[in-house]
Amino acid sequence: MQNIQCEAIVLGVMDYGEADKIVTLFTLEHGKLKGLARSAKKSRKRFGGALEPFARLRLHLAMKVGLSTLNGADIVTIFPHIRQDLVKIGHAAYACELVERLVPEAEQNHRLFRLLAAYLDHLDQFQHDPSDRRFFEANLLKVVGYQPALSRCAACDADLAGALVLRWSPSSAGVLCGRCGKTGRPIASQTVALLNRAMDTGRFGLIRFSPTELEEAGELLNAAISCHLSRPLKSLAFLREIGV
């Protein structure tokens, strides 16, 4: 057992027995891990309000394979403005659940940690914009290695630059040329260009989709994400319930 300190974002929390909690964390230094917080339900002195979903923490833990032990936590930020807005809460929960479901345990990924932290920070500071969700999804897929083919045909590898007709299908790994995607769903070249720009741009708030582009990008990204999930996302159902 190794005693360490690390920076982490809380992905999820569940009760364990009468007094304890099991916390799923995404850490900068060690990737995703689960930690047991003893007596977290009975006493707030040890952890205060730190063990809340999508809080950013500095952790003290005894690390071991399977289930680590949380010995203490210092709050970096709880993203207070997110917690005052139901739509922002839904999107923060969605981002954290995506990371939890798509990332294996104990696999360090600095880029993904920074992406998630940047999205939560942007949600906290600015009014929610649907384009930011698509920006996060596109970059998440890129960082974890599930990026859909956007510049070349996913079927024949033809260069899509200047193509007049572009399509995609849920069974494809990206966008198809006119010859390969005769029965696929149409997608505008401008939508594809914006998705490519989103993955080349390092900051939230710089890419904005029109309503039509949002719909097209959303359909493609949702399909690209869904094929890597074994069951539906609870947070996505919540977003639909609140009309987002």
Swiss-Prot record:
GO cellular component terms given for this protein: bacterial nucleoid
Gene name of the encoded protein: recO
UniProt xrefs under SUPFAM superfamilies: ArfGap/RecO-like zinc finger (SSF57863), Nucleic acid-binding proteins (SSF50249)
Pfam families: RecO_C (PF02565), RecO_N (PF11967)
GO biological process terms, semicolon-separated: DNA recombination; double-strand break repair
Stored Gene3D superfamilies: Nucleic acid-binding proteins, Recombination protein O, C-terminal domain
Protein name: DNA repair protein RecO
PANTHER family (alphabetical): DNA REPAIR PROTEIN RECO (PTHR33991:SF1)
Role this protein plays: Involved in DNA repair and RecF pathway recombination.
Family the entry assigns: Belongs to the RecO family.
Keywords associated with the record: DNA damage, DNA recombination, DNA repair
InterPro entries: ARFGAP/RecO (IPR037278), DNA_rep/recomb_RecO_N (IPR022572), NA-bd_OB-fold (IPR012340), RecO (IPR003717), RecO_C (IPR042242)
